C-alpha cells in the first residue's frame, strides 16, 4: 500500500528491520538500504535493467535477502512542486510495485538528489563514468536519509 503520511508509514514498520529506498530513473534504478535501527542509509546497488518485471523481481530479492519492512520511493517533482512526466512514470511504477509486495510504500520528494549525489561523488575525485554508474544508488541513500532524519526529528 502507498502511504502518504510519514507518521502512518512509520507506524506500519516492523521494529529492527531495515528500509530500502529506490531512485527510479529513466535509465537506471538506484537502491539504498538502511540499518536495522533506521539510523544510517547506505547505497546498495544500481539496477540497469529497464524491464519492469525484472526490476520488481530484483527488488523482491533484495527485500527478501535483507528482510526489509518498508519501501521509500523518490518522487521526482519539479522545483516549483509540480508534476512532471517522470513523476507520473514513478507513480505508475509504485502502483505496480504495490501489487507485488505487502509492505508499506512511502513516496518522498527527491528534488536535486541525483545532482547532489553526482556532486558528492565528484568531490572525492571519482571519474565521470564511475559517478554515472553509482550516482543513482547514492541518490537513493540521500532520499532514504531524508526519511530517516524526519523520523528522528519527529521522534517517531
UniProtKB/Swiss-Prot annotation:
Localization of this protein: Cytoplasm
Main enzyme class: hydrolase
Entries under SUPFAM superfamilies matching the protein: Ribonuclease H-like
GO biological process, one term: rRNA 5'-end processing
Broad class of where this protein is predominantly found: cytoplasm
Gene3D superfamilies attached to this UniProt entry: YqgF/RNase H-like domain
EC number(s) on file: 3.1.-.-
Lineage top rank: taxon: Bacteria
Keyword Transmembrane helix: no
Role according to the record: Could be a nuclease involved in processing of the 5'-end of pre-16S rRNA.
Family, as annotated: Belongs to the YqgF nuclease family.
Protein name in UniProt: Putative pre-16S rRNA nuclease
Organism: Rickettsia typhi (strain ATCC VR-144 / Wilmington)
Amino acid at each position: 500500500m502507498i502511504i502518504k503520511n510519514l507518521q502512518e508509514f512509520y507506524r506500519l514498520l516492523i521494529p529492527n528491520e531495515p528500509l530500502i529506498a529506490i531512485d527510479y530513473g529513466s535509465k537506471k534504478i538506484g537502491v539504498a538500504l538502511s540499518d536495522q535501527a533506521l539510523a544510517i542509509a547506505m547505497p546498495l546497488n544500481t539496477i540497469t535493467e529497464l524491464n519492469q518485471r525484472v526490476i520488481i523481481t530484483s527488488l523482491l530479492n533484495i527485500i527478501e535477502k535483507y528482510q526489509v519492512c518498508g519501501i521509500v520511493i523518490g518522487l521526482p517533482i519539479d522545483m516549483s512542486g509540480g508534476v512532471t512526466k517522470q513523476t507520473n512514470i514513478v507513480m505508475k511504477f509504485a502502483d505496480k510495485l504495490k501489487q507485488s509486495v505487502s509492505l508499506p510504500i512511502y513516496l518522498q520528494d527527491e528534488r536535486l538528489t541525483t545532482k547532489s549525489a553526482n556532486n558528492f561523488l565528484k568531490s572525492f575525485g571519482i571519474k565521470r563514468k564511475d559517478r554515472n554508474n553509482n550516482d543513482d544508488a547514492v541518490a537513493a541513500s540521500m532520499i532514504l536519509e531524508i526519511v530517516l532524519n524526519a523520523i528522528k526529528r519527529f521522534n517517531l
